[in-house]
């Protein structure tokens, strides 16, 4: 996937989301930079690009619902939902079920019996995406694949593909000048 939209998104992510300095990632690993993608996924222009590019990336996958583990997946899913094209609904997987109300682990559109795309903002190990995959599968949803905006090339693709799932990303570290 190439083109002006992808180049513009890469520039916006570099400018808005790449933070240099020693950080501990959610995986527990340390890195010299952090890609705080919420700064891009919640930006008016970047969000529109993410929605279009993620739809383009997964155009050959048949799904009607998109979502993933809160919080990183939430704006990615809604960007896809609002991007031009066929109707796609969204859902959110909580980190744990609510103790009150409907006590649901998955909120939003129904995933039971649906073909589902699981998304992430940034993938490191793939654990967040796989948590969402298993939650969807546990209620009878069929996961068609996992897509992420930025892949850190640190094992997510391998972990997700080891589960028998397809995996794609819009951007890699080289696109952000971080390779």
From Swiss-Prot:
Pathway: Pyrimidine metabolism; UMP biosynthesis via de novo pathway; UMP from orotate: step 1/2. Orotate binds at residues 124, 152. It comes from Mycobacterium tuberculosis (strain ATCC 25618 / H37Rv). The keyword Magnesium applies. It comes from the Bacteria. Belongs to the purine/pyrimidine phosphoribosyltransferase family. PyrE subfamily. SUPFAM superfamilies: PRTase-like (SSF53271). The gene is pyrE. NCBIfam families: pyrE (TIGR00336). It catalyses: orotidine 5'-phosphate + diphosphate = orotate + 5-phospho-alpha-D-ribose 1-diphosphate. The keyword Lipid biosynthesis does not apply. HAMAP family: PyrE. GO terms for biological process: 'de novo' UMP biosynthetic process; pyrimidine nucleobase biosynthetic process; UMP biosynthetic process. It is an enzyme of class 2 (transferase). GO terms for molecular function: magnesium ion binding; orotate phosphoribosyltransferase activity. Homodimer. Catalyzes the transfer of a ribosyl phosphate group from 5-phosphoribose 1-diphosphate to orotate, leading to the formation of orotidine monophosphate (OMP). InterPro entries: OPRT, Or_phspho_trans_dom, PRibTrfase_dom, PRTase-like. Keywords: Glycosyltransferase, Magnesium, Pyrimidine biosynthesis, Transferase. It holds the Pfam family Pribosyltran. This is Orotate phosphoribosyltransferase. Transmembrane segments: none annotated. Its cofactor is Mg(2+). 5-phospho-alpha-D-ribose 1-diphosphate binds at residues 94-95, 98, 100, 120-128. Its EC number is 2.4.2.10. CDD domains: PRTases_typeI.
């Amino acid at each position: 996937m190439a083109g002006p939209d992808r180049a513009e998104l890469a520039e916006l992510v570099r400018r808005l989301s790449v933070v240099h300095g020693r950080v501990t990632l959610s995986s527990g690993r340390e890195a010299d930079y952090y890609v705080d993608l919420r700064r891009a996924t919640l930006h008016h222009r970047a969000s529109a690009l993410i929605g279009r590019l993620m739809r383009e990336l997964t155009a050959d996958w048949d799904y009607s619902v998109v979502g993933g583990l809160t919080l990183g997946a939430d704006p990615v899913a809604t960007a896809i939902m609002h991007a031009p094209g066929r109707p796609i609904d969204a859902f959110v997987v909580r980190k744990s079920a609510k103790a009150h109300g409907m006590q649901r682990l998955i909120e939003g559109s129904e995933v039971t019996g649906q073909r589902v795309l699981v998304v992430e903002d940034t993938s490191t190990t793939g654990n967040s995406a796989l948590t969402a995959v298993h939650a969807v599968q546990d209620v009878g949803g069929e996961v068609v694949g996992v897509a992420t905006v930025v892949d850190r090339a640190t094992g997510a693709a391998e972990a997700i593909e080891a589960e028998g799932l397809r995996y794609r990303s819009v951007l890699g570290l080289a696109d952000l000048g971080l390779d």
